[in-house]
């Protein structure tokens, strides 16, 4: 069931977590929703397909911000919100084959996306009302896309892929619904069910800073109209010959992180917090039960060097 009152034991637990952070000089940055949906919200409302979930999210945000605003200065609304394009249920709690309104996959996805962006804006507004000194941001899985060749159509595909990433940022950072997906929506017969009140909320609920995870870059290859999203996860048929790959086929691209930082700062001019970057590797313990993690050390060093270069470029990076 969906409770009317919060779980005090759970709230008290995070009081202790934040107190412990401050004890050691750690400034917490808190993600409000990180892929952890109450089962009842998924079963009864199909996650963010329902606008009732927006109201529940508002209630949740008010609860935690009022409780922790003296302990938490930095808030993120959702984790990797754009992953809803590729893993809808994980990101939004909405299952594609359980639409309450019988929507097809494309329509459901973008209705859910709109509801999440609306919920994000409402969360930012609440943070500003309750704790004017606090900052509220957004977070996406940031991808750098390279055209597969110098063929002009591949660059068109690159722009399309990047715009599907920027769509989330443009709404959350600029407070406007961009034009560039209009043609795609028309081709896919996707209807935008936005009210004037929705548009006004998006304008008011703009993020103070932006944040992202970065794990790899990807290759854009044109395959005809209507264009298809290259995606966020790797495609083994489009490996970059200039980059090494992980055992799972993810490109290792430290320079891509510098590119990502410059792209975002040029477009939005907002401070940036890098929420995640890392690598998966096969590891084994030696006879002393130790893991000599030199590969990961080198990976992190290479990416930190590129963050430093981006800062020299003039990008305002305030945390990693």
Language-model segment annotations:
Residues 1-2:
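Conserved small/polar residues in nucleotide/adenosyl-binding loops
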């Amino acid at each position: 069931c969906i409770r009317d009152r919060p779980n005090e034991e759970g709230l008290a637990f995070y009081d202790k977590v934040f107190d412990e952070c401050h004890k050691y000089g750690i400034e917490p940055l808190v993600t409000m929703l990180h892929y952890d949906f109450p089962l009842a919200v998924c079963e009864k409302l199909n996650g963010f397909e329902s606008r009732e979930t927006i109201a529940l999210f508002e209630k949740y945000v008010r609860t935690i911000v009022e409780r922790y605003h003296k302990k938490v200065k930095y808030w993120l609304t959702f984790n990797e919100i754009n992953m809803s394009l590729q893993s809808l249920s994980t990101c939004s709690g909405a299952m594609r084959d359980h639409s309450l309104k019988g929507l097809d996959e494309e329509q459901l996805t973008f209705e859910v996306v709109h509801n999440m962006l609306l919920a994000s804006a409402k969360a930012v507004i609440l943070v500003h009302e309750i704790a004017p000194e606090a900052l509220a941001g957004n977070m996406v899985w940031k991808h750098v896309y390279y055209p597969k060749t110098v063929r002009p159509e591949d660059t068109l595909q690159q722009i399309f892929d990047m715009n599907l990433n920027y769509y989330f940022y443009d709404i959350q950072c600029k407070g406007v619904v961009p034009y560039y997906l209009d043609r795609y929506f028309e081709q896919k017969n996707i209807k935008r069910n936005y009210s004037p009140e929705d548009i006004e909320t998006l304008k008011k609920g703009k993020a103070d800073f932006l944040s992202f995870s970065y794990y790899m870059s990807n290759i854009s290859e044109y395959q005809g109209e209507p264009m298809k999203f290259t995606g966020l996860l790797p495609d083994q048929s489009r490996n970059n010959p200039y980059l090494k790959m992980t055992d799972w086929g993810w490109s290792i691209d430290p320079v891509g992180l510098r590119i990502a930082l410059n792209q975002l700062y040029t477009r939005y001019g907002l401070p940036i917090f890098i929420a995640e970057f890392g690598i998966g590797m096969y590891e084994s313990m030696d006879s002393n039960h130790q893991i000599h993690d030199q590969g990961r050390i080198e990976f992190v060093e290479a990416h930190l060097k590129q963050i430093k270069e981006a800062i020299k470029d003039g990008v305002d990076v305030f945390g990693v």
